[in-house]
């Protein structure tokens, strides 16, 4: 029997109404009021979900019908509160989740593997989500594929952040490629995505898109992986020792010049600059802070040994290259045992002090894993990190006899700072994690490109990094995770070429005219907060970013789980090109709620386009048995 297929504009997603064998089936479910109006009383037997991201199922708690989901999507949707309790611990990349489920429990969720959905067939197609599912239907001699977020019209990818399953290894994209090729073998004629028009010539379009996306994923790989020689980029002893450095007589420490030391182990460097007055300062501060960091001596013991060997009477401060916790792990020891201050760039100061407010990967609490791996980040036992001095772009400051320039140096992340100084006759730039030494002229040596780092290439990422370094023209780059790069200009130019190519590829795959929206998971995002024990409420900030070259209008509201209320939670703001705006909303528990983790989302329209509850964060309610160890 032939099916009748109707496309319903569900607001934040397409929903498809299939009438067949006397039964009405929906694929995905949009905004409830629009859906009910479009359905006009039709008797729906079940809803088949392609994935569990909110824009396809956020309002299903209002719809009393059987909901069918497969694999991990079922696991998430069948226990929403269980997912949120483990926020940042499951389906995450260095602590940043890559699934975006609803904040309220949908009704009647059934496990797809236990259901008969004939005459449709379900095909597992992970990538856009862990168990993304495509549904096939043969009708009237045509094979339809309901493809969810797998591919959009014009050979576009819905976004990058949902595919960011790891930190630079591109497994989410490679899984998407596998799914595209699997679906190609099913030979569909027409593809019906969840947020674009239909795609005709489905089999051919899938094959072309799979090849393009495979090339893109390989292009995005961190360059030490793409070159196929990880050791060459990471093994600090293999090239530097005897060439640019000599052993300092302490395990894991090299002397680069009379007044510059490097501690290196397990792919990470910290630098010690010695001053004329026998004091010293550090650039970054980790050497052996967590399990797996190698066999260096205990950190404080090592620093004391170096102080005696080099006549250092005081460690003044630590200059931080970027916010990632692996560059900060031993700072608490530096403060407690040596009195060293922490100096950071202005756009990372709050992230360092209040990491739980942000959905960035690799914040310091992430590294409190080991024996505490089952703990919420809010329960970390790591001490609070206080910033002593905030540096601005272009600021020149002195530490004893050394003059140092701090400058915004994004790349791997927007929240990066470079430090430039002349030392022992050389002009040095300390560059953090933005670039790796690469003798291979075919690659740039770029580090990870992760959109969750906030790293749009032109102003927040690798293009700005390359152009700042090109203008600076240092003799050497002192890198966070690789060899020293001597005479670095050829490699800086290769990094610039990579960044320009990256922008073109982002434009190629973006379903929006301005690629920045596609690669920015922070353009309308709430921030996490804590409701302290004995309190009933807190202020939740929502940050808006206009990535357009023209004004953009943002309309929306805060969405909360049951038991919470936000007074005057709506907003309507127009931002000029490149504008930024932070809004604050007071959220209150209507009655005492159990201690734990609770989600908060922002329901967003931009220039009249309905995006739904796109981005999220969490509120931590402290109480008996649950207290944040990393408080404000």
Identify the role of each PLM range:
Residues 592-628:
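Terminal connector regions
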Residues 574, 588-594:
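Short, surface-exposed loop/turn segments at beta-strand-coil junctions that are enriched for proline
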Residues 160-161, 165-269, 277, 463-555, ...:
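Accessory terminal helices/loops
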Residues 24, 114, 119-208, 212-216, ...:
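Metallo-beta-lactamase
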Residues 550-563, 603-604:
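Short acidic, flexible loop segments centered on an aromatic residue
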Residues 31-115, 289-291, 297-396:
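Active-site HxH/HxHxD metal-binding segment of metal-dependent hydrolases
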Residues 573-581:
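Short proline/glycine- and polar residue-rich coil/turn motifs
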Residues 1-39, 134-152, 252-308, 418-437:
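Conserved beta-strand hairpin/beta-sheet module of binuclear metal-dependent hydrolase folds
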